[in-house]
């Protein structure tokens, strides 16, 4: 590990646990990334794409209706307004620029909810790169609008039927492809997890979320928030929000994992709260696993949070007490999803609804407390409307006009 340019670990978590054939590939990627970060032209090109193609900066919106009856001020960082519909577009643009700089001619990616796949497909279309997307067959079925979007933009989408046919299996398939085709192919990993240097690369391309949020909240309120809250699957939207606040110790960092059908049922995706440390997906990190080390299936109503592990920097932030990680059930996320749509006219992604649900819990616990909260609304909910409609119909929920 001493041969790496950057520290591959966050405390005890992280590392490069990959087949020997991929070690030089990862080190070349790290070298190219370090050089690109020192190149003003690369940075200018990246920031120009974020501004004039993706639509940054994104808005910071105050929720005036959801907080009625309390003394809380609640703001949403509107990554749902980014081109592509989620925060994923930020780091995808950065990684594809990096791949082109390295002379790669093909992009592969995994996707769960389909948002990373859509972001990869749109950026590949615009930057002229062939694109192969791996997606669990279960997710292909529940995220059909995003599958159509990817194919419309020229991506080849492969439904992975192995294992549980979910995100972790798509990740494994993408890694296999990369091991066979690394000479001309870049694996555009979609979250702040996996082997070094991916967690660092993804964080650096996502940190603009927190940088903008800090500037915007200071301009609006004249002070830093009491807490920033973000959903955590692999952890990219959360680390993008948290990064600029880590040194601001007055700001609580709250990550929200999926409790699924309830932690006690075992059907959840909360490795930070209820996992044990293991080796998975090229890294050492908290993991949902059996006592003998077999990977357990994660579960969430949200495809993008349905992942049995988490990025190593989140594990480190938890270990040193800088960030706290809570969990929200499917039902709580569904309630927040409906509340935001009904009272603010914003339809969030189910992933983002988990973060919002925890913020609403904080408000309900202490309505008289004056507090300033920011939720990272990491994506829009267009992709989830059919899932939500089906579930609410089964529950007998009807939609009545005001």
Swiss-Prot record:
Record-listed E.C. numbers: 4.2.1.20
Chain positions found as N6-(pyridoxal phosphate)lysine: 88
Signal peptide interval: none
The entry's keywords: Amino-acid biosynthesis, Aromatic amino acid biosynthesis, Lyase, Pyridoxal phosphate, Tryptophan biosynthesis
Pathway where this protein functions: Amino-acid biosynthesis; L-tryptophan biosynthesis; L-tryptophan from chorismate: step 5/5
Catalytic activity field: (1S,2R)-1-C-(indol-3-yl)glycerol 3-phosphate + L-serine = D-glyceraldehyde 3-phosphate + L-tryptophan + H2O
PROSITE patterns documented for this protein: TRP_SYNTHASE_BETA
PANTHER family referenced in this protein's UniProt entry, alphabetically: TRYPTOPHAN SYNTHASE, TRYPTOPHAN SYNTHASE-RELATED
Role description: The beta subunit is responsible for the synthesis of L-tryptophan from indole and L-serine.
Recorded family membership: Belongs to the TrpB family.
NCBIfam families assigned: trpB
Assembly with partners or alone: Tetramer of two alpha and two beta chains.
Protein name: Tryptophan synthase beta chain
Source species: Pasteurella multocida (strain Pm70)
Source taxonomy: Bacteria, Pseudomonadati, Pseudomonadota, Gammaproteobacteria, Pasteurellales
Name of the gene: trpB
């Amino acid at each position: 590990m001493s041969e790496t340019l950057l520290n591959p670990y966050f405390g005890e978590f992280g590392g490069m646990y990959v087949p020997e054939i991929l070690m030089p590939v990862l080190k070349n990627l790290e070298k190219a990334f370090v050089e690109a970060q020192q190149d003003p032209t690369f940075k200018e090109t990246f920031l120009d794409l974020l501004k004039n193609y993706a639509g940054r900066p994104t808005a910071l919106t105050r929720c005036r209706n959801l907080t009625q009856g309390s003394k809380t001020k609640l703001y949403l960082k509107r990554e749902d307004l980014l081109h592509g519909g989620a925060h994923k577009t930020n780091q995808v643009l950065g990684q594809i620029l990096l791949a082109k700089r390295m002379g790669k001619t093909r992009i592969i990616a995994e996707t769960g909810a389909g948002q990373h796949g859509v972001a990869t497909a749109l950026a590949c279309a615009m930057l002229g790169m062939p694109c192969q997307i791996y997606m669990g067959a279960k997710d292909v079925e529940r995220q059909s609008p995003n599958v159509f979007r990817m194919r419309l933009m020229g991506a080849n989408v492969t439904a992975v039927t192995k294992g549980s046919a979910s995100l972790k299996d798509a990740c494994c398939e993408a890694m296999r492809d990369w091991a066979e085709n690394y000479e001309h192919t870049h694996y555009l990993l979609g979250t702040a997890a996996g082997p070094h240097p991916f967690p660092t690369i993804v964080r650096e391309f996502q940190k603009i979320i927190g940088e903008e949020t800090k500037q915007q909240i200071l301009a609006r309120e004249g002070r830093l928030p009491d807490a920033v809250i973000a959903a955590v699957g692999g952890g990219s939207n959360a680390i993008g929000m948290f990064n600029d606040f880590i040194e601001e110790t007055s700001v609580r960092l709250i990550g929200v994992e999926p409790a699924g059908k309830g932690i006690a049922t075992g059907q959840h995706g909360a490795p930070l709260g209820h996992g044990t440390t293991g080796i998975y997906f090229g890294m050492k990190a908290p993991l949902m696993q059996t006592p003998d080390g077999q990977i357990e299936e994660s579960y969430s109503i949200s495809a993008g949070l349905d992942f049995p592990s988490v990025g190593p920097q989140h594990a480190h932030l938890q270990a040193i007490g800088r960030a706290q990680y809570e969990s929200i059930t499917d039902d709580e996320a569904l309630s927040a999803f409906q509340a935001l749509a009904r009272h603010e006219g914003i339809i969030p992604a189910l992933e983002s609804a988990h973060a919002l649900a925890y913020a609403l819990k904080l408000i309900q616990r202490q309505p008289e407390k004056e507090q300033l909260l920011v939720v990272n609304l990491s994506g829009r909910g267009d992709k989830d409307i059919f899932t939500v409609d089906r579930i609410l119909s089964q529950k007998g929920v009807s939609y009545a006009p005001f």
